[in-house]
Amino acid sequence: DSAGSIYFSDSGSSKVRRIGVGGDIAVVAGNGDFADHGDGGSALEAGVRSPGGLAIGPDGALYIVEQTSHRIRKVDTGGTISRKAGNGMPGYGGDGGMAVEAGIKGPFRMVFDQQKNIYFSDRDNNRIRKIDTNGIIHTVAGHSNIGWVQDGLEVHITVHNFP
C-alpha cells in the first residue's frame, strides 16, 4: 500500500494479514471462520473463505479474491467489507450486468489498470474478465474450452487453461 505495508493471504486460517513497515503483523480481514459472511460489517468479524489474490485499489481499499466463495470482496479504508463481484455460486454469466450479480467460478488473481478497472482471472471458467468503474462485468478473453493460448487469434476467441 502507499505506507509500504505488505499484504498476504493466510488461506489456512481464513484470514488476510498485513506486515507493517515496522515488521508488525496484523489481521486486516477474516475472523478465522471458513465461511463467507459479514458483508457490510467489520472485515475483522467477517468470514473470509479461501482468500487468494490481493490488490490495493486506486481508492486505497484492499481487494480480496475468494476462490471457493466464487467472488471478489473489498475492504475499504475504514475496515468495512463488501462484495465487489460474484453472486457466491459457482457459474458463468452476467456479462453486461452488475458484477455483484454475476456468476464467476474460482477467481484467482486480479490487477487494476490505469483507468481503475479491475481485470481478474475467472480461472475455472477459463476466462479473463473485467469489472469497469461502474461495476459492470465483461469477458475480455477466453471461452469455456480448456486449452492453450493460440497466438494470432482475436482475444475473445482464444483458449486458456486455467488463467
Over which residues does each language-model region extend?
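A short loop-to-beta-strand structural motif that recurs across blades of beta-propeller domains
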Residues: 14-18, 24, 70-74, 80, ...
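Gly/Pro-rich loop segments of beta-rich domains
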Residues: 24-51, 80-108, 136-163
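Residue-level detector of Asp-centered blade-edge/turn motifs that repeat once per structural unit
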Residues: 1-3, 56-59, 112-115
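Short loop/turn segments immediately following the C-termini of beta-strands
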Residues: 11, 67, 123
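Conserved beta-propeller blade signature
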Residues: 5-7, 61-64, 117-120
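Low-complexity/repetitive intrinsically disordered segments
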Residues: 1-6, 162-163
